[in-house]
Structure formats: structure tokens, C-alpha cells
Swiss-Prot record:
Gene Ontology biological-process annotations: phylloquinone biosynthetic process
HAMAP family for this protein: DHNA_CoA_hydrolase
UniProt organism field: Prochlorococcus marinus (strain MIT 9312)
EC identifiers of the protein: 3.1.2.28
UniProt-listed InterPro entries: 4-hydroxybenzoyl-CoA_TE, DHNA_CoA_hydrolase, HotDog_dom_sf
Protein name, per record: 1,4-dihydroxy-2-naphthoyl-CoA hydrolase
Active-site residues per Swiss-Prot or TrEMBL entry: 19
Amino acid sequence: MKPSDWLILQKKVRFGDCDSAGVIHFHNLLKWSHEAWEESIEIYGIPYQDIFPDFSIRKSQIIFPIVNCEANYLAPIKIGDLLKVKIYPHKINPHLFRVNSFFMKNGNKVAEGKIIHCSLDVDSRNKIELPDQLERWIEASNISTNLKEC
């Protein structure tokens, strides 16, 4: 598997994603950014439940709350647009990581999102190191930092 398999994804803009002006509702960009990195780790091979556990089934020792997020809109995104979403994860320090998402339409960047997560112990809420499998995903993703496939 090559990095583009888990770092370049697609998103089709649906009617329900848009507001009355016919462009995406502002909150959807951050939602799509989060969904993209969720999909990316699954494609990479990390079981979804290891990062986002169902606490009714089993209790995870780690949670990843969002501590910062941003969205920038560079051009209108409309119903029916097919977007490529390029993911760039980056380790900030032992307990923080950032995922940048670049949304491309017809080869042009139309939006970007940034989400920063903190790794915490579920009981104490103290900061803890990122789990090894997440570290491996970040490291493997950064091997090819200049994906030109959009």
C-alpha cells in the first residue's frame, strides 16, 4: 500500500451538506476533516475501535479530545462537487498531534481544515503519550509529505 491510498480521499458534496445559499454549511468542513482522518486510519489498517471505542462494549484507556480546530474557505463548495481530501498528520509533541486537511476541486485548493488532538488517560484525564499504532500512522504518512496526486 502506498501513502496516497490512505492520505488522499474523496468526498461528494450532498444536498444536506449545503445551506440555503447552495454552498456547504460552515460546520461541515470540520466534520469532513475529522471523518477523513478516521477513514485514513482505517485504510492504513488501524482498527477503528482502537482509536474510537464503543464504551458500551469495552473501555479504552485513551481518549483524543480536540483542543483546537480551524477551517478556511478559499472558494465556494457546492452541491454535487467532487472533492479530493489530502490528509497531513503531524506529531506536535508526545501527547499532541495535528491533522491538516486540504480540500481540492479540479486541482485547486478550495478549503482547508486543521484539527489538533490531545492524548489523555480516560480516567485521570492526564496527558499521555500517543499510542504506538497512531505514531506509526503519523510516521508513515510523513514519508511522502509532497503528494502531487490531486
